[in-house]
């Protein structure tokens, strides 16, 4: 008997791609075939094949910040992308499609509807992106990570890597910690220059109280090392951290952006956080961060308000007991079965 097949529509950023990979891997273990639809010039083109998943491409890009010519051409570009996606869907014959966001899922979702293939949507953020808002009207089933994106969609959490849930619980991790507070600073793929420039000034005032790991992003190690100056021995600086689960588990508190995936990873491990949301016009990251700050598992500092002095005052007053309580609250907000639940819904609605 032929295996069932899922076509994944996701691309652009890790926040869309990594949760989709987690769902794909769950279904692969259940003898499903997976095919991916993306764009050639975004991260999925390099990343997805590393997981042994075949990928096909359509031509589409975002319109935000583009000139008038691009806007005038947009209807033709979208129509062309729908036709390209329709051809691929007719060739691949999937039993269901999973839309996880990114430009690619718009035209691909319309093509799936035209081909009569069930559409399962998953919204990773606390506020729905434009593509998912539109696709939500034609989708067979809509799922969401946070309870605020769609009024009646099932809340399943964000599918995150299994190794995050395998870390020891916060009370076990904290049981033998007596030395300096451990601070993990994650600039993320957007670099978060604001964190790279602020933290060296914080450490200059609190060097005797903090031990830092700082992920600075691509090409920033030398510049940030110079900013730390004489306090460099208190800090472990890296471009990227390969084992994020271990890094989160090492930390007493994480200072980072609040992309949807990051918020759910922090909940999965159970660690306190100071979120500095990226200043997006629809407040996406701020609303993601509220998922944990509303239960006192995290603090939000708006980028406009972030100063070294403010961070020094906040960190100075933190105790390990405070941070353990925050970590335990974060852990209660995690949803360890997200990938499994999305996979179940796909199986339920598939042709």
UniProtKB/Swiss-Prot annotation:
HAMAP family: MurG
Originating gene: murG
Organism field: Haemophilus influenzae (strain 86-028NP)
GO cellular component, one term: plasma membrane
Protein name in the entry: UDP-N-acetylglucosamine--N-acetylmuramyl-(pentapeptide) pyrophosphoryl-undecaprenol N-acetylglucosamine transferase
Role played: Cell wall formation. Catalyzes the transfer of a GlcNAc subunit on undecaprenyl-pyrophosphoryl-MurNAc-pentapeptide (lipid intermediate I) to form undecaprenyl-pyrophosphoryl-MurNAc-(pentapeptide)GlcNAc (lipid intermediate II).
One GO MF term: undecaprenyldiphospho-muramoylpentapeptide beta-N-acetylglucosaminyltransferase activity
Annotated keywords: Cell cycle, Cell division, Cell inner membrane, Cell membrane, Cell shape, Cell wall biogenesis/degradation, Glycosyltransferase, Membrane, Peptidoglycan synthesis, Transferase
Catalytic reaction equation(s): di-trans,octa-cis-undecaprenyl diphospho-N-acetyl-alpha-D-muramoyl-L-alanyl-D-glutamyl-meso-2,6-diaminopimeloyl-D-alanyl-D-alanine + UDP-N-acetyl-alpha-D-glucosamine = di-trans,octa-cis-undecaprenyl diphospho-[N-acetyl-alpha-D-glucosaminyl-(1->4)]-N-acetyl-alpha-D-muramoyl-L-alanyl-D-glutamyl-meso-2,6-diaminopimeloyl-D-alanyl-D-alanine + UDP + H(+)
Annotated localization: Cell inner membrane
Residues noted as binding UDP-N-acetyl-alpha-D-glucosamine in the record, renumbered to the chain: 13-15, 125, 161, 189, 241, 260-265, 285
Family (UniProt): Belongs to the glycosyltransferase 28 family. MurG subfamily.
Pfam families in alphabetical order: Glyco_tran_28_C, Glyco_transf_28
NCBIfam families listed in its UniProt record: murG
Gene Ontology process terms (BP): carbohydrate metabolic process; cell division; cell wall organization; lipid glycosylation; peptidoglycan biosynthetic process; regulation of cell shape
UniProt EC number: 2.4.1.227
Gene3D superfamilies: Glycogen Phosphorylase B
Enzyme class name: transferase
InterPro entries recorded: GlcNAc_MurG (IPR006009), Glyco_trans_28_C (IPR007235), GlycoTrans_28_N (IPR004276)
Membrane topology, from the record: Peripheral membrane protein
PANTHER family per record: GLYCOSYLTRANSFERASE (PTHR21015:SF22), UDP-N-ACETYLGLUCOSAMINE--N-ACETYLMURAMYL-(PENTAPEPTIDE) PYROPHOSPHORYL-UNDECAPRENOL N-ACETYLGLUCOSAMINE TRANSFERASE 1 (PTHR21015)
